[in-house]
Amino acid sequence: MSLQKCQEEWGELEKEFQQLQETHKVYKQKLEELNGLQNLCSSYINKHKRRLTELKGNLHGYKHTSNVEEKELVQQINSTIKERHNAFFDMEAYLPKKNGLYLNLVLGNVNVTLLSNQAKFAYKDEYEKFKLYLTIILLLGAITCRFVLHYRVTDEVFNFLLVWYYCTLTIRESILISNGSRIKGWWVSHHYVSTFLSGVMLTWPDGLMYQIFRNQFLAFSIYQSCVQFLQYYYQSGCLYRLRALGERNHLDLTVEGFQSWMWRGLTFLLPFLFFGHFWQLYNAITLFGLSRHEECKEWQVFVLALTFLLLFLGNFLTTLKVVHTKFQKNKLKKP
């Protein structure tokens, strides 16, 4: 290329750079405007919430009024207040907010709010794919440890993978909750408990107690991964249909349990889930028995027994509550 052409090329680059600077200047101005609007919205929401709380407290005195019209008015206002809080939840999903304790400990005070629906859905979709791929890897790992590689070091690798998997799930779920996902209750706590359980399994030294429980735990892991794969496959299809009908939020997630929206076509999963829950109870009973063994010296045995019992109670009672609530609603619908 001749020097003259290089000079012409440089001249074009200079013009483009000037345009880029102007565009970037406008971008920074818009960003400042956006930050100002975000702060304004957050301020209005907090102020509105405080006033609604005060109003709800004032209305509480009229809860047992004998006047029918006043009673209906109070119920109507309380119902509207509940809807208003749901609207605030949706608004706050697009506004920067302080992270919860867990995210602060893991990530620090970093803004994790995604501003567009496209970005939120892409992150949710990536989370679901992560769960699917790791479920398959964990299934293969459990099968390999159970039937092929009978070494403590391979068990350690498998248990470390479980710890990393559940830790990562808790972080990603916390980010999704900050962005408007309505996953809550036991199905969030469940992963924290599973992280703890996997960590204790990782620290359990090799010995007689470990070898007695090893095959039972690996068989349980194989079954659990198979059920989780089934849940992902059928829940994702069900959620897609419900979102298309406008009956579910675009950030609703697949879970390792049973929720009310799954009654439409997913009740066949219940026997598999209940069998898995009772297997957790069986694990707890086995470990409680091992903890009383005369050769048991490891603290991990009793702690794991309590953790499996906690998982059983949480999973079983939560699933049972969903089933009971559904039957109660069906009874009310009958003439």
Swiss-Prot record:
Bilayer-crossing regions: 100-122, 130-150, 157-177, 193-213, 268-288, 300-320
Keywords in alphabetical order: Coiled coil, Membrane, Nucleus, Transmembrane, Transmembrane helix
Record's signal peptide: none
Keyword Nuclease set for record: no
Any coiled-coil regions, as ranges: 1-39
InterPro entries: TMEM120A/B (IPR012926)
Cellular component aspect of the GO annotation: nuclear inner membrane
PANTHER family: TRANSMEMBRANE PROTEIN 120B, TRANSMEMBRANE PROTEIN INDUCED BY TUMOR NECROSIS FACTOR ALPHA
Protein name: Transmembrane protein 120B
Organism: Xenopus tropicalis (Western clawed frog)
Gene (name only): tmem120b
